[in-house]
Amino acid sequence: MKFNIKNGTPEKQRSACVVAGIFEQQKLTPAAEALDKSANGYITGILSRGDMKGKAGATLMLHNVPNSACERVLLVGLGKEQELGDKGYRDAVRAVFKALSDTGAADATLFLLEAPVKNRDLSWKVLQIAVGGLESMYRFDRLKSKVEEAEPKLQKITLGIIKSLTEEEQTASEEALQQGLAVGDGMSLAKDLGNLAPNICTPTYLAEQAMNMAKTYKLKVTVLEQKDMEDLGMGALLAVARGSRQPPKLIALEYWGGAKKGKPVVLVGKGVTFDTGGISLKPAGEMDEMKYDMCGAASVLGTVHAVAKMGLPINVVGIIPATENMPGGNATKPGDVVTSMSGQTIEILNTDAEGRLILCDALAYTERYEPEAVIDIATLTGACVIALGHVASGLLSNDDELARELLDASERAVDRAWRLPLFDEYQEQLKSNFADVANIGGRAAGTITAACFLARFTKKYRWAHLDIAGTAWKSGKEKGATGRPVPLLTQFLISRTTRQPGSTGETGSRKNRRKSKE
């Protein structure tokens, strides 16, 4: 789907559909006013009959609007004008694309940039429309023999704006559009990987996808095999892989777009392509969803894809420890003690606490990059779902400044995160009588003790941990990967390349971007 930004008045747009907003109490936005004036009160006449009241997310499709060059006019409710915030605006965008996908329209012109969203500027709205559009049109049907839903005919979106933009506004808007499209593409990639069946998306498959991306964007990729990990002493990662016939991989994907000797930001994504729990076997119900236990890895690949597509002037390394966690005659047993790459010994009390085992070796491996900062992303604990539900990802960090950067990015991207503590007192729960540390700390504060375990392997750099167990996928009727936290991670990296006040969502200047290879 193609996007562009264009000045003009809505009634003169030769488009299959023009979209305009309506506030509650039937107050028209400037675009709706222009359409209504051209049509001699046609729209206000319809509204006066009660067909639409401007409720947030409501839509009304009109055909043959008098004196309008377009085939259709879609009205979308924006709620109360003084209360329009992030959620209301994003809900309206999704409602628009849902309504458009149900029509035969091949193109549409959206006049939604004029809506006054609290504490957000034009660039933020442009980015949200691009991301929301791609997200709304996403389909995953590649494994079906017959496609149940016809492909949407919508191919072109124009972001219309009545007022003339300054050169600075035009540049910032175009930049935001490219960022939004890159984020949307990165989310789609992460969703595709998460939604694939686990017999397809294996550790080897993830390595192949990284190699394909490296070829496309001329990145450096390294794939460590089991023998390489043995030589490095990655006893924790290999302990998880012992029960599976699928060979484990450790994937390193390097993007060097910043200063030649600049330290990279390293993203470490948990890549358990299927998690049975191992000998500590999970219940059968909903075990199919454990194919999503590699969504941390998927988000790293999606973020690196977005960064490379934008050509950001920053150095980023993605590290993915990938394996299955299966029971078997050679599988790790509860009570086994293994030696991690760092030299620390670990008593494995529960084989279903495997994510932290593969991450601890990946985090130790990360030291060779002398990173500026490290962020690991993992579907790590059910406790995080209990604590934060499916709205916010859990954030824990050994560095306050890094945590603030990530929280700011989460607010700008509307990809929520919430910080939890890493108090030393929680380390008491990880004590073992037989090793340096146990891999679980009991039921209490499960998200925190999991991060406390990881913190033991991150002493040499600034580090943050994102627990995405509640946000990486949806269950039930809408089952599927969400693509989170690609928006948060990408915004975090964008913010590091530009001066970007948190309240306005500014996206910076094009001149700060590295030329993209696409």
Swiss-Prot record:
Mn(2+) 1 binds at residues 275, 352, 354. Residues 495-507 have a biased composition (Polar residues). It is found in: Cytoplasm. Residues 495-518 are annotated as: Disordered. It catalyses: Release of an N-terminal amino acid, Xaa-|-Yaa-, in which Xaa is preferably Leu, but may be other amino acids including Pro although not Arg or Lys, and Yaa may be Pro. Amino acid amides and methyl esters are also readily hydrolyzed, but rates on arylamides are exceedingly low; Release of an N-terminal amino acid, preferentially leucine, but not glutamic or aspartic acids. Its cofactor is Mn(2+). PANTHER family: CYTOSOL AMINOPEPTIDASE, LEUCINE AMINOPEPTIDASE-RELATED. Belongs to the peptidase M17 family. This is Probable cytosol aminopeptidase. It comes from Nitrosospira multiformis (strain ATCC 25196 / NCIMB 11849 / C 71). The lineage of its organism: Bacteria, Pseudomonadati, Pseudomonadota, Betaproteobacteria, Nitrosomonadales.
